[in-house]
Design a protein with these regions (language model features):
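Matrix-facing interhelical linker segments
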Residues: 1-242
């Protein structure tokens, strides 16, 4: 077994423990946008959530997340590493971009059903989860993941300095920026997945209907991405160095 597959899964568990509360806030924020409800900033929301429902309520939806994160990050890091070693492409930037595109698409196949379960758990009681549309939002998730993975594959491999803190900052910064860029696709993904029925609105119809609302939850998602990739890449690179 390629060690990158094992270490990729372990890095995913570590990153999720840090980032899940922010991810929970992002989904609840986007849900309030869809429903026309008042929206709260992240810190007041979390304080109120803890006071009302306890600290562990910030980890609602964590079980499907943690169950899925091992194969998801195994794919994310493992496929990148395998592609980087085996793709016969001389230009390194092109090779890392292609590796990221492949890893992102493969990750989406594994991730989407768990994302549907996680998002519906955050918005409804577990008894109301509807999994017949387990691949709702797949195309939007695939676009988002492929672009995101390409950016991280580039930043993690093209930047070859040994300074772990600087590499942490490069990966976290790349994740933050690309999370902002791909936010409209994340909005579409969540819009499809948060509904029990199959949602039919096209991307361009959504742009006309929601306009700047498509960037709701942008910074909470960007913070989540920065934590995930900063911490995840740090753990993965550290383990791979042995």
């Amino acid at each position: 077994m390629d060690k990158s597959l094992l270490y990729g899964g372990l890095s995913g568990v570590v990153e999720s423990c840090f980032s899940h509360p922010i991810d929970f806030y992002k989904v609840k924020y986007q849900e309030s946008v869809f429903n026309g409800q008042p929206r709260k900033h992240m810190i007041p929301f979390m304080i109120n959530q803890v006071k009302t429902n306890g600290f562990l309520s910030l980890y609602t939806g964590f079980i499907p997340k943690i169950v899925s994160i091992i194969p998801v990050r195994t794919t994310f890091w493992g496929v990148q590493d395998i592609c980087n070693k085996n793709l016969q492409i001389e230009n390194e930037m092109t090779k890392y971009t292609v590796s990221g595109l492949v890893a992102g698409f493969c990750q989406t196949i594994i991730e989407t059903p768990a994302e549907v379960a996680k998002i519906q758990m955050m918005g409804h009681k577990p008894s109301k989860i509807v999994m017949k549309n387990a691949f709702n939002g797949f195309r939007w998730n695939a676009i988002r993941n492929s672009v995101f993975c390409s950016a991280i594959c580039l930043s993690n491999n093209y930047y070859q300095k040994d300074d772990k803190f600087l590499k942490f900052m490069v990966n976290a910064s790349s994740a933050f920026v690309i999370s902002v860029v791909t936010q409209p696709f994340d909005f579409m993904k969540t819009k499809y997945q948060i509904n029990d029925h199959t949602y039919k609105l096209s991307f361009f119809d959504a742009v006309r209907e929601y306009k700047f609302k498509m960037f709701s939850g942008t910074f909470s998602r960007a913070y989540t991405g920065a934590i995930n990739m900063g911490v995840g890449a740090l753990v993965f690179n550290y383990l791979m160095s042995y």
